[in-house]
């Protein structure tokens, strides 16, 4: 079974790499935005008193680029792939083979996690080499927040795949959810500049908690217990509902 799963995961990896749009939005775009905007907009590299003296390109913008990659995978790539497989009867046919449908689901999750790790590593390393962005001041905290946040976003993606009747619907719903969730995370208005009420609302959203946790870890601070609890709650709730509602056919 382990050998079969390895072959299945390798096939899924090759299929992912053959999707140029998925590779672009999940890997190239976040890294490219970080480097392009960091190099061309002087204000990104200036110390900002409203950010505690940090440069905007350091913790805030770098965290948002990491988040952008994970959200793209969780709300677009993963659910679309699973719904397309269901529409084409791939999951149903797998149920008659030694490789069960659950193995395909696990392979999809594995590929998306690996891609998110690759994109994040490139973002951090190239940001550090090109822009002087500090590496995470608290590496263990960063890994913990990144792992929990990625699990949460992928669980939301599984829920979308579970309830969406078609690939067109899941793509539309995923895109619609992506923009407000990224806004609440601080993509266009950094969280320190948000009105108090909006920032409090953001604290209880999966992307708001994820983004702030990443910023804390990048700045060398421990993530706030509230944000870890919010991420764990969203992951558990959406994961359980997705498992209950997911349809193989």
Predicted regions and their residues:
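Membrane-interfacial helix-loop-helix junctions in multi-pass membrane proteins
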Residues: 52-55, 134, 186-237
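Transmembrane helix segments
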Residues: 28-29, 35-44, 161-204, 208
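Hydrophobic alpha-helical transmembrane segments of multi-pass membrane transport/permease proteins
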Residues: 17-45, 59-77, 118, 177-183, ...
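Alpha-helical transmembrane segments and their short interhelical loops
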Residues: 101-174, 179, 222-232, 239
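Short helix-to-coil transition segments within interhelical loops
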Residues: 93-102, 163, 206
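Transmembrane helix boundary and interhelical loop/hinge segments in multi-pass membrane proteins
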Residues: 74-99
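A short amphipathic helical element positioned immediately N-terminal to and/or at the very start
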Residues: 2-17, 214
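Short helix-capping/hinge motifs at transmembrane helix termini and TM-loop junctions
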Residues: 37-46, 79, 127-135, 164-165, ...
């Amino acid at each position: 079974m382990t050998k079969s799963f390895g072959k299945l995961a390798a096939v899924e990896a090759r299929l992912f790499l053959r999707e140029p749009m998925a590779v672009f939005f999940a890997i190239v775009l976040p890294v490219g935005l970080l480097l392009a905007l960091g190099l061309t907009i002087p204000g990104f590299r200036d110390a900002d008193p409203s950010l505690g003296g940090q440069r905007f390109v350091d913790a805030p913008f770098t965290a948002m680029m990491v988040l952008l990659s994970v959200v793209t995978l969780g709300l677009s790539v993963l659910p679309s792939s699973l719904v397309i497989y269901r529409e084409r009867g791939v999951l149903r046919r797998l149920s008659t083979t030694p490789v069960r449908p659950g193995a395909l689901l696990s392979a999809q999750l594995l590929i998306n996690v690996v891609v998110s790790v690759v994109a994040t590593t490139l973002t951090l390393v190239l940001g550090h080499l090109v822009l002087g962005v500090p590496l995470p001041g608290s590496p263990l905290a960063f890994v913990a927040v990144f792992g929990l946040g990625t699990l949460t976003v992928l669980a939301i993606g599984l829920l979308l795949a579970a309830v969406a009747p078609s690939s067109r619907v899941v793509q539309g719903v995923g895109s619609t959810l992506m923009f407000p969730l990224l806004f609440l995370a601080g993509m266009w208005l950094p969280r320190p500049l948000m009105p108090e009420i909006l920032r409090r609302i953001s604290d209880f959203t999966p992307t708001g908690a994820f983004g702030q946790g990443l910023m804390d870890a990048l700045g060398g601070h421990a993530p706030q217990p509230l944000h870890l609890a919010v991420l764990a709650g969203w992951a558990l709730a959406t994961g359980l509902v997705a498992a209950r509602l997911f349809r193989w056919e």
